[in-house]
Amino acid sequence: MLCAVYKSRKKAETYLFVERREDFSRVPEVLMSAFGRPELVLMTKLDPAKPLGIASTSRVMEALQSQGFYLQVPPPPENLLEQHKAQLKAERE
């Protein structure tokens, strides 16, 4: 399965996968508005045996077939303060 991958100019590390290049017809307007003007990053052939990074290839393929797009957002930032507090608490016990 071929797909086009676009990055957002508004949201860092946010990518939109669509079935065909320049075809955003199945992407909701509100999402396109929040995403901003898409910038093509690459055209790729999805292969379940090859990892994509954050998202699983099979999940991306399933979303493309069912809804016509897949939105990849960055993982939430680490809360270093909470980690530090938990470590201090564990050391005291």
Curated annotation (Swiss-Prot):
SUPFAM superfamilies reported for this sequence: YcgL-like (SSF160191)
Top-level taxon of origin: Bacteria
YcgL domain mapped to chain residues: 1-85
PROSITE patterns named in the record: YCGL
Protein's name according to its UniProt entry: YcgL domain-containing protein AHA_2135
Source taxonomy: Bacteria, Pseudomonadati, Pseudomonadota, Gammaproteobacteria, Aeromonadales
Database matches in InterPro entries: YcgL-like_sf (IPR038068), YcgL_dom (IPR027354)
